[in-house]
C-alpha cells in the first residue's frame, strides 16, 4: 500500500504532541517523515516544550500554528481536527497526568479527549532505562492504564537504548499498523 493510499484509508491530519525532553528537537525530523507519507502535520507542545524546540521553524515546516495553550472559547479552531495522534517524546510527567485524566494543559486536554473518543493514539515515552523514573511505581501503572484505555504505548528501551528514542520511520510504521488494525 502506498503512503497516499494509507492516508486516504486512515485520515490525513496527524497531531504530534511534544513534551519537554532532551529529545524534543527530534520532532522536526519526525514532522518531515510524516509529511513524506503525506500526513498534514500539526504540532502541539506542552508549555515547557516550547523551550526545547524552534517554534517558528516548526510552524513554517507544518504550515500551521504551533499551539501550546488553550484558546478562548469564542476563538475559532486554528488547527484541523486530528485523525491520529503521536506523542513524541512522551515524558514521565505527561504520561502519569494523562493516565489520571488530568488536563491542565492543551496537550493533556487533547490527549484526554481523544482517548475518550477512542481515536488512534501512539505514545512514545522517553524514559531512561534504569534511570529511576522507569522503576517508579506510577510509571508502569500509567503505561498499563493507558494501554487499557486503548492507547498504544511504544516503550522498548532494550531495543532503543537508553531512553527509547525511536526513529521517526519506526514510529510512523507502528502508527500505520495501528490504523490498519482499527480499520478491520
List PLM regions with ranges.
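A cross-family phosphate/adenosyl-ligand binding-site feature
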Residues: 1-184
